[in-house]
């Protein structure tokens, strides 16, 4: 997979190095030469750039990357402007780092709904989530195994767990299935959880499936979706 990480402070550099070590193609960008020079041997490609300059940003391979992560934390203004430029250039998968509720609100207003909050999520876990497409949540069991929550693929809706055959096809264990139950007009929505569901379970619209297994197998399942 290919990623661009903009902003190589502690969070951004940790994320970029983690992705590089896992064999992904990474372009790391910072506006400080000192940071670029310090990280040149730890990240696949690293460059100095002012990403608030639209013409400079246009030189990046934006359409040939799986995600662009704006990890700028010190300068909120630069973060917002950089994200606005990426949005204007119609980059498909943009992830913005947020540092406050107000920052998140502004990003939502400019159409950046995919955000991360490093103070509550580690760079390693965000690295995992970037690798497993469509994952709603990832919990690391050990260096090889994870538990992942996915929205059930549309093609599985109205079909049984046995038909999906995740165990044989992907060597993944279905731990639980979460179902959103909509109540009446005056009552709230409720999420019910089915632990260790039977093979006869029939998937419903908006179900969330919780599966456990090797990270590599999760990636294969995610690609199929």
Regions inferred by a protein language model and the residue ranges of each:
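Cytosolic Rossmann-like ligand/nucleotide-binding regulatory domains
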Residues: 2, 160-225
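A generic structural signal for short beta-strands and their flanking turns/coil linkers
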Residues: 92, 112, 144-146, 170-173
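Glycine-rich adenosine-cofactor-binding loop
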Residues: 4-19, 152-157
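Short, flexible, solvent-exposed loop/turn segments with mixed acidic/basic and small polar residues
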Residues: 136-141, 198-201
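Cofactor-binding loop segments of dinucleotide-utilizing enzymes, especially the Rossmann-like FAD-
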Residues: 8, 31, 99, 179, ...
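Cytosolic ligand/metal-binding cores
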Residues: 11, 15-16, 20-27, 31-132, ...
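Extended boundary segments
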Residues: 138-169
